């Protein structure tokens, strides 16, 4: 009964536990913060570990010859999301100044639009994409944090961060890939674990969210989420379709705001104190965008994937053959 319900919801294996975790963290956080294994598995403390294991298991399914496709697909998604977020934010900043427009500063816009939720992407690619789509997740992790936001706002001086961020993100998947290529039996054994971990990842991430942030972010936070999802997402989908020659479902899957993006305005304000007056408001708006896009994007991605085709739901035999060739 529970499984049938979860399968009816787009990315339900992750989204439903995520919402449950967010509800508990909002109203009764003390239930899961009792220490030991309970806190480790049912709070945000366990998120990175669960995601790391998930990526390791995914890595065991990859062959070295597939890495070119991974870099190409992931690179298009990463760059296009950065370009649209930076472009909107810079234009707003140049035209309207630091206060921005409609209550949204360029700090809030760039922080939200350039950062994507990798776990939502991975869950959606598990439902609609192929293993090359899934393997692009560590590459997309580069935009999860302040680095690209700082670049977009002209705050340099951290040239070693991109390389180290990439190394840290691809470590689990690289080790898994090496072991999987050495021993196919090991690959066959570990491959299913990626899907099994989805609800645990979802709950851990949800336990780091507070639903009251939607209220604190106000109408501007909701507007920011809509900009991230629909304006940013539409641009990424166009790049995915015309550069990568893909149907576009992966483009929608990265049209989110990362949970970690909530900390970005404070980091930027610390680097450039002129942004301090705007940091608190931007933080609440980015938090609202993170929650809203985590709900909207799975619904949109599911609709798009089924309407225009994806590896799990090809439109016709010709598209199915194309997906098999590209996988």
Sequence positions of predicted segments:
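Hydrophobic transmembrane alpha-helices of secondary-active transporters
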Residues: 18-30, 40-73, 173-183, 192-217, ...
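Entry/N-cap segments of selected transmembrane alpha helices
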Residues: 39-45, 62-93, 144-145, 209-240, ...
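Cytoplasmic-side transmembrane-helix entry/capping segments in multi-pass membrane proteins
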Residues: 9-16, 69-83, 132-141, 167, ...
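Juxtamembrane helix-boundary/capping and inter-helix hinge elements in multi-pass membrane proteins
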Residues: 62-72, 95-104, 114-136, 142-143, ...
């Amino acid at each position: 009964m529970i499984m049938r319900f979860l399968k009816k919801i787009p990315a339900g294996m992750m989204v439903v536990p995520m919402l449950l975790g967010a509800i508990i963290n909002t109203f009764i956080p003390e239930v899961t913060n009792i220490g030991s294994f309970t806190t480790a598995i049912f709070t945000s403390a366990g998120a990175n570990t669960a995601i790391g294991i998930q990526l390791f298991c995914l890595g065991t399914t990859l062959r070295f010859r597939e890495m070119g496709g991974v870099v190409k697909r992931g690179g298009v998604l990463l760059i296009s999301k950065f370009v649209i977020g930076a472009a909107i934010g810079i234009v707003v900043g140049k035209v309207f100044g630091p206060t921005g427009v409609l209550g949204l500063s360029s700090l809030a816009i760039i922080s939200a639009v350039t950062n994507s939720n990798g776990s939502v992407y991975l869950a959606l690619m598990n439902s609609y994409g192929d293993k090359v789509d899934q393997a692009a997740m560590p590459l997309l992790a580069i935009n999860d944090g302040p680095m690209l936001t700082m670049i977009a706002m002209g705050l340099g001086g951290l040239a070693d961060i991109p390389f180290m961020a990439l190394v840290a993100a691809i470590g689990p998947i690289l080790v898994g890939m090496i072991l999987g290529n050495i021993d196919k039996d090991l690959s066959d054994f570990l491959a299913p674990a990626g899907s099994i971990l989805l609800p645990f990842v979802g709950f851990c991430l949800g336990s780091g969210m507070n639903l009251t942030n939607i209220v604190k972010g106000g109408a501007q936070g909701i507007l920011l989420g809509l900009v991230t999802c629909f304006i940013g997402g539409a641009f990424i989908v166009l790049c995915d379709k015309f550069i990568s020659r893909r149907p576009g479902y992966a483009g929608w899957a990265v049209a989110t705001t990362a949970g970690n993006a909530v900390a970005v305005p404070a980091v930027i304000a610390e680097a450039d104190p002129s942004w301090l007056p705007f940091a608190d408001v931007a933080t609440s708006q980015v938090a609202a965008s993170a929650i809203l896009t985590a709900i909207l994007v799975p619904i949109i991605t599911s609709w798009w994937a089924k309407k225009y085709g994806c590896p799990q739901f090809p439109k016709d035999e010709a598209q199915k053959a194309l997906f098999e060739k590209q996988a």
